[in-house]
């Protein structure tokens, strides 16, 4: 692909989004950017990982509110700079919002049936189904809260995306291949 592009991937917890994004980036021959983006920013603000987790959590304490906004703005700036330099896949980070007006962006949201997600989470983390359900609720709530706080939008609104894909019963490689084909068609069409 000659033209520069950006693929953003939002996802429900337990859909295999990280694996799908990793495989997609490999198929497209581009870099994947995800939560590791925060590492240099975390160091700059002299924050521990626990503090970053608190900032990103469902109910951050008042002390973190200003740091949280600064952290998000730094992260957004870094994501934009990286996307200006090269084609890439961005996992999470409210990418759909950051690149909402960018014609180079192909915005994807991955969802799946609850039982599929529960089984994946329980297997991956070696926990029972009840524990998996609680974790799914907690992570999805935290992601939705973060998204609404910084974008003013719900990540579940299909209008934010070019493609919303139910991955229930699909292998990550199949999903990544399908998204890659969509991206290639979009790029060639422009």
Regions found by a protein language model. Name each.
Residues 2-6:
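Extreme N-terminal starter segment of soluble prokaryotic enzymes
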Residues 52, 66, 128-173:
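Small-molecule kinase domains that catalyze NTP-dependent phosphoryl transfer to phosphate-bearing small molecules
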Residues 36-87, 94, 127:
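ATP-dependent small-molecule kinase phosphotransfer cores
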């Amino acid at each position: 692909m000659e033209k520069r592009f950006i693929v953003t991937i939002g996802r429900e917890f337990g859909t295999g989004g990280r694996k799908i994004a990793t495989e997609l980036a490999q198929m497209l021959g581009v870099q994947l950017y995800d939560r590791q983006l925060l590492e240099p920013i975390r160091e700059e603000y002299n924050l521990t990982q626990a503090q970053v987790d608190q900032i990103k959590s469902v109910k951050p304490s008042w002390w973190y509110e200003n740091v949280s906004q600064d952290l998000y703005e730094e992260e957004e700036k870094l994501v934009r700079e990286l996307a200006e330099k090269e084609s890439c896949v961005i996992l999470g980070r409210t990418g759909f919002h950051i690149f909402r007006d960018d014609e180079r962006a192909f915005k994807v949201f991955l969802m799946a049936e609850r039982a599929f997600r529960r089984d994946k989470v329980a297997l991956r983390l070696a926990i029972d189904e009840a524990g998996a359900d609680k974790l799914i609720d907690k992570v999805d709530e935290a992601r939705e809260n973060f998204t609404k706080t910084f974008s003013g939008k719900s990540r579940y609104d299909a209008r934010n995306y070019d493609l919303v894909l139910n991955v229930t019963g699909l292998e990550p490689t199949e999903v990544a291949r399908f998204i890659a084909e969509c991206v290639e068609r979009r790029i060639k069409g422009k």
